[in-house]
Every structure is written in structure tokens, then in C-alpha cells.
């Protein structure tokens, strides 16, 4: 079963992260690199991607005659998606274990940040069936 593990954050949280020491940032990224390596070795890794900040996001709708209408950034959003992992695992419990490990990434001084990670199953419909 495939699951998406979504890491969300707030502007305040991102601003705090930007104030971390270089060693704290390196420790955090080493944790993520090790997690990715372990998932690749177990065959559970599908992909992961960081996302640009909300200041670069646009909302697009089809306007008259199908011409796209682009709305600007919505700074009032309380949380925004920072990045995601897609994993292919045997059970929901395994997806939760991976999410907990992701959540426990080190922050300042090496203490776990315990960031909430949203876990959702990816439905396995083929495009032709839609």
C-alpha cells in the first residue's frame, strides 16, 4: 500500500528553523538522509520532495473560455505543506512508524521537534478507470 506522509508548517516555524545553528541544520538533514537511505534499502521508498514556500504559491482556476485565472499568495493560511514522502509499505502501522521517525527529527540542541506528519493512503485506481 502506498502512503503519502505530509510535513506541514507555519510561517513562525519556518522563521524559527531559519534561526537554527549550522550544526543543528546539519544534524536535522543527516537524520532525513539516513531515513531516506533506510527506506531505499528496505524497498519502501518511492519519492520525497521539499516544496517552495507559500510566498511562491499560486491558486489557478479556469476562467472564461478556459483562460487561466491566477490568484496571488494567501498569507493568511495558518499552515502550508513543506514537503512530502511517498512510501510503499505492507501496513498502515508501518506508515505510522515511518511518520513518527520523520516527526522525531532533531531540532535545536538535538532535541526531537515532534512535528506533526499527516499520513494518508494513496488510492490505487488506474487512470483508465476514472
Task: Walk through the language-model features, giving the residues of each.
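Conserved, structured core segments of small domains
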Residues: 1-130
Amino acid at each position: 500500500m502506498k502512503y503519502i506522509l505530509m510535513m506541514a508548517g507555519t510561517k513562525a516555524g519556518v522563521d524559527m528553523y531559519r534561526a537554527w545553528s549550522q550544526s543543528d541544520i546539519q544534524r536535522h538533514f543527516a537524520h532525513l538522509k539516513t531515513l531516506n537511505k533506510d527506506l531505499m534499502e528496505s524497498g519502501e521508498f518511492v519519492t520525497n520532495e521539499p516544496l517552495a514556500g507559500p510566498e511562491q504559491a499560486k491558486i489557478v482556476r479556469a476562467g472564461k473560455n478556459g483562460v487561466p485565472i491566477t490568484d496571488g499568495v494567501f498569507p493568511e493560511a495558518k499552515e502550508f505543506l513543506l514537503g512530502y514522502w511517498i512510501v510503499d509499505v505492507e501496513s498502515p502501522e508501518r506508515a505510522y512508524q515511518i511518520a513518527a521517525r520523520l516527526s522525531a527529527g532533531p531540532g535545536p540542541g538535538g532535541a526531537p521537534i515532534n512535528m506533526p506528519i499527516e499520513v494518508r493512503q494513496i488510492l490505487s485506481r488506474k487512470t483508465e478507470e476514472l
